[in-house]
Amino acid sequence: MPKRRWIITGLVAGLLGLAIGATAVAAPSIAAIACPQCYGLSSLGEGVYAERDDDAYQRIVTTAEQRISGFYGERTSDARVLICATEECYQSIGGGGEKGQAFGRWALRLSPDGANETIATHELAHIELHKRLGSVYESVPDWFDEGLAVLISDDARYLDPANGGNRCRVPYEEAAPIVDADWATFGDAGSDRKYLLAACVVTHWVDEHGGAAGVLTMISDMRAGKKFSELQ
């Protein structure tokens, strides 16, 4: 009987090893989030893991977190952040052509081109919104999720300076159709114009709803069961 137990234990361990290996091959992003060190990323503290031991990465994340707190009044999320200094690293953890990517409410990765305060804030803004919304976060339209992230990150590629007045870089009438568009298929391949349009619409929405307080009310209402379309 003891021998049989050892055989079963060995089989279970082997199967677990195969499962972990299969996950690493099929879903490197998930595997890297679970074990950053397995992909050559070292801990810089505070949940930040980077390919290169550089204090600048920690400062980038700290500044991004402060921007999130500055908008909402406080930060509720606590994401694991993976930062790559080379394209080889970024590809190994499942990255593609994007500068960064958030994963639900738990983690984000930054490419070499995305390791800056703007992109880090953008991705953390997604995570903060998702964390605050809880299980209903997928009910928020992509255009709002992305446009709000652009606004919070104050991305100069898509918004005019915050010196009062209209921040849209296109006429609002030109931007408005993004609300009814399919975010995943909108625009030409490789174009980021949809972020420009979403930023314009969301900036107007936030202004019309009382700023960050309006976003907090929206979150509260959605958690209480209201649909986003009912909050317009």
Can you describe what each PLM-predicted range is?
Residues 125-133, 153:
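Active-site-flanking alpha-helical
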Residues 38-54, 105-106:
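Acidic/histidine-rich, surface-exposed loop or edge segments in extracytoplasmic proteins
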